[in-house]
A protein has these predicted regions:
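A short beta-loop-beta micro-motif enriched in histidine and acidic residues
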Residues: 66-73, 81-95
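Non-catalytic C-terminal accessory modules of carbohydrate-active enzymes
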Residues: 157-161
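A short beta-strand-loop-beta hairpin characteristic of the jelly-roll/cupin
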Residues: 86-89, 93-117
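A short, N-terminal "cap"/entry segment at the start of jelly-roll beta-barrel domains
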Residues: 1-70
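A short hydrophobic beta-strand segment most commonly corresponding to one strand
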Residues: 95-97, 122, 135-155
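Short beta-strand His + acidic residue motifs that chelate non-heme Fe in jelly-roll/DSBH
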Residues: 85-88, 105-106, 123, 128-134
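Conserved hydrophobic/aromatic beta-strand scaffold that supports enzyme active sites
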Residues: 57, 74-78, 95, 112, ...
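Short acidic-glycine-tyrosine-enriched beta hairpin
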Residues: 71, 109-128
Length: 162
């Protein structure tokens, strides 16, 4: 089922839109920004105001996406420069494809992975992980599959610097 997006902004939109001159991908995302339904899945009490000011995603397809399906989920996500995404996990398996910027992925049982554009990181179901963005922040395509598609990630510990 198709669901017409209802435009919903996030505090980071002006930052994303200002990146339009950095390349075609940024320009395309900046053009979509005012028409997309941006989502944040945490509260200020959970992650702090700084995190919320520098984070958000668009669900392309999935239980709450533009294209509604229970088979899988796809997001385009933005995490700002130097942002730390605290330890969290979710039942669904997850793959990140870094589109722009850099991110240090640290996951339980895996060696740390510092990835740039084209880098891919897989997280198993229930695997706790953190992310630390590089100096440019990160745009990524994030894919979920398996059980727990409609659930949000849950934090395992309070953020280090909220």
């Amino acid at each position: 089922m198709f669901e017409q997006p209802v435009p919903q902004g996030i505090p980071a939109l002006p930052t994303i839109e200002a990146m339009a001159g950095k390349g075609a991908l940024y320009a395309a995302l900046a053009a979509v920004c005012p028409h997309a339904s941006w989502v944040q899945t945490y509260s200020e009490a959970e992650v702090g105001r700084h995190f919320l000011d520098h984070y958000g995603h668009i669900e392309l397809f999935g239980p709450a996406g533009i294209f509604r399906t229970q088979a899988c989920r796809a997001f385009i996500g933005y995490w700002g420069p130097g942002l730390f995404y605290p330890m969290h996990d979710h039942e669904a398996e997850e793959i990140y494809l870094v589109l722009t910027g850099r991110c240090l992925f640290e996951a339980e049982g895996d060696a740390p992975a510092d990835l740039g554009p084209g880098g891919v990181k897989f997280h198993r179901s229930g695997q706790s992980h953190t992310m630390t963005m590089g100096d440019e922040g990160m745009l990524a395509l994030c894919l979920w599959r398996g059980a727990g598609l409609a659930d949000n990630a849950k934090l395992n510990a309070p953020p280090a610097n909220s």
